[in-house]
Amino acid sequence: MRKLLPFIGNPHGSGRSALTCRYRCGDACFHEVPNTSDNEYVGDVIARAYSRRAMLRSAAVVTVATAAGSAVAFGGPGQTANATPSADAAAAGAGKGGEAARGLRFKAVAPNTDDKVTIPEGHEQNLVIRWGDPIVKGAPGFNPDKQTAAAQAGQFGYNNDFLSLLPLGGDYERQQLLVANHEYTDENLMFKAYDANNPTREQVEIAWAAHGLSVVAVQEDHRSGKLTAISRHQLNRRLHTTSEFRLTGPAAGGALLKTSVDPTGTKVLGTLNNCAGGTTPWGTTLHGEENFNQYFANAGQVTDPTQAARLKRYGVTSGATERKWERFDKRFDVAQEPNESHRFGWVVELDPYDPNSVPRKRTALGRFKHEAAQPRLTEDGRPVVYMGDDERFDYFYKFVSSKQMKKGNSRAAKEHNLTLLDEGTLYVAKLTGDSPAAELDGTGKLPHDGEFDGSGVWIKLATGNVSHVEGMTAEEVYVFTRLAADKVGATKMDRPEDVEPSPRTGRVYIALTNNTDRGKPGKEGATEANPRNLNKHGQILELAENFDDPAGDGFAWRLFLVAGDPNDPATYFAGFPKDKVSPISCPDNVAFDPHGNLWISTDGNQLGSHDGLFGVATAGERRGELKQFLTVPRGAETCGPLIQDKRVLVSVQHPGEIDGASVEKPQSVWPDGPGKIVRPAVVSVWRKDGRNIGVCPDQLTRGGVSRETPPRASTSLNRHIVLNSPPVSCPREAGASSPRPRRARWRTPPRSPARPPAPSRW
């Protein structure tokens, strides 16, 4: 019998180092949970559904009760409870029999603790760009011993996260624009002899300049997936803590967003803690402001009880902040500038093609710890944006625009599309288990039918200037969205981070990273959607909108993956044999490849190995087959995955961020080797033979040129984005188990005029 992999974590049950916790999120998990509402916890929801199934099975009931008017049904065999788990087979790329899913045909990387980026056999990699590399005209080369704020303002920022690539097209066919978030700074790894209690103004201003966003043109290699940054390109740009941003939408200009410096309530300096994001169909990028609360000081000095409660709900620092920015700019002191923190925690929209544009913070999408924001379109062309609030026991949301996207690259279309995220309806999710509570011990033990699932509804919070929450104005709903969601009874989740709709099926996948507070005394226990107490490893929830209508108000849900050591009975991989998958812990970011496979990056692996990037099939016979594609260096996190036909792009964030590390005592030598300062960077990975990632051999022509790569459109420099690339298909191969993925087990009946949409059950 195989042993479980070791649990590695800090005293609070996190796989991150204390250094990462301190600088990334202000030790969020060491503070009290901000959500003190009595709203239902998703673990309780799961528990009821499981208990109900157990009772039905014990009574020999073999049919699943389905609500009248169900919009989505769910069937098919689940994972058997007695599956023999093994993490070892994953390293050999073993599977159910036959080939792996298309796009995942590579030899899986074994878990390891190597201080490098480890990639599959037959692949190559290169550094695309690193912290400090000059990107704008006049920026000097990186010299950590002579760094200045002015230099950093023209160089690639620190701790890159979300990545997007937007093609330029036309005469610049082999060039793309790389857009990157810079989430946070770790001054211990940036400055020699750094004194956290007494930072200098120069150090603080360098850190201000190292936050924010970067736009960098990159050159493609026509024979491989290699990318090379084009320094000082005309479209290159840095946005940081002192750059101008504009507040737009229904809350802009309101009293809650006005400050002594900005009496209009529409202009704000900077963007902070940008984590993940999204790329819109109209060619802009979205950027989530996540742990912004840690930058604001002295909430404990606020005496007004209403204001104090609002600050507490958002976790604003009670005393001095870790970075001490409030010493150098009073706007970071809420006792002196009470509304400044309200101007952070939004989704930022950027037009990368216009270096003179002012990025916009979209208030219609609500204010909370935005991990990401990824849109899809309704059938009539209205954007729907899914979002998670990365906090223990908080919620996930969606925004449905009231406007339709205009196609084309005309000025009129561009101007119209830049208003799409200012008008619409903001919703929060409430999940329901399909059965009453009966038995759940918090271990995550699967029910006899092998699935955690249920139904849900989207609850309206606000539409334009109209509030749907009793006792709150529309402005209050947008600025204090968490409090609005508390009032309407949204379901508490286990740190909902990245949320991505599949471009192939429309199903939505939500990364729930972990929650080690679940089940502790005084805290909510396990529920159906979060079935484990002291949840160290996290899970991924799959959501199907009723009638495949993203603008609707009902959905079905189920857990697609329950992470951890496959030897652990509490883990689950969508019914795929657990002895054929890679171990995974703490899913964070998610992305899709052109084949419809889900790719997952991890943050805070608690299984004793480094964080990594994983691919998993979401449909067909291989559904649930999880394979590790790469691992990152010591102390690093994998984030910002971007999967294209010929390359995999990732951010390697905070390498060497291990307790006790400093510039003088580095804990990693990546990426430049011994004697060099450790630098976060972007890495591109491709196949040595130049062929597409993870495809079948007979799909390719001679010379490594792929037939399935869609042709590039010839467009102007100012606007080009490929929408809805055709799915990649693979001819039947000898030994393959099926010529095409079979349909997923969710069944969506056609809409009937006599049967209106209703919450789904299965």
Residue ranges and their predicted role:
Residues 579-619:
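Loop/turn-rich, solvent-exposed surfaces of beta-rich toroidal or solenoidal domains
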Residues 201-207, 224-237, 394-480, 484, ...:
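Beta-propeller fold recognition
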Residues 99-281, 286-293, 302-358, 382, ...:
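Long, well-ordered hydrophobic secondary-structure segments characteristic of membrane-embedded
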Residues 114-130, 138-153, 223-265, 348-367, ...:
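Blade-edge beta-strand/turn elements of extracellular beta-propeller
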Residues 211-218, 343-352, 399-400, 535-546, ...:
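Beta-propeller blade signature
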Residues 48, 54-77:
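N-terminal export signals
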